[in-house]
Amino acid sequence: MHQAKKRFGQNFLTDKNLLKKIVDSAQIHDKNVLEIGPGLGALTQFIVKDAQKYLAYEIDYSLKDVLENFLSEDSNIIFQDFLESDVTNDLDTYFKGEPIHLIGNLPYYITTPIIFKFLEIDQLKTATIMVQKEVGDRMISKKNLKSYNAFSAILQYFTDVRLVVNVNRKMFNPVPKVDSMVVQLTKKETKLDKSLELKFIQIVKLSFMHKRKTLLNNLSTGLNEDKAKILESLKSLNLDEKTRAESLGVDDFITLTEKLYK
């Protein structure tokens, strides 16, 4: 029996009803699927039955014999670190430019970089992913909630985010220290052009840089802009100098970016 490896963040899920629910929620019938970290094939066994073509990245080469039991002529596994691979080239070669749907029980320690890589690659259209509950709470959070932060706002600018299911830690082997959550991300048409998107991301990150500081102080410190101009832009949104970042929704940050830079 394969022993989970701590250095790879391995925790294996075995409840077949839950596994099937996760795959069903991804709606991948006759679609192209990329799986990250298939592990012992818990999700893989259901994905390959539905998917048109299947590709996976698995960092642990010792799982090769186990995973090859699930493969057919329309499926393949690359035994490499997803974050260290030339993913765009691999996807172009294998899927020939067609849309792809990402599924994965993500290692907690690399969840955020994987999500940002998903956002960067145009071919990847949706992601149905298992994440640490604390991270999932941030992903689905809304303004004025304690869990709402820069990551929440940036992610929700690029995608529609929905909760699929909460997963108790006791459903894993070995049992991790935290609960999990399955969320689904669906990329959407964005509202700003590319140059303004970079400004939007900068503004959001700076706004949350020091949560105890006001929005005005964070932005005037971080942006090379006149403080009076920033305050004028805030007032045009019916905000004042005491406003803090967590009270702005995604659309508010979009409008603020346009006020400052259009």
Please annotate each region the language model reported.
Residues 181-187, 192-232, 237-240, 245-257:
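An accessory alpha-helical subdomain
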Residues 259-262:
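Generic C-terminal helix-cap and adjacent flexible tail
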Residues 1-206, 246, 250:
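Catalytic cores of RNA-modifying enzymes
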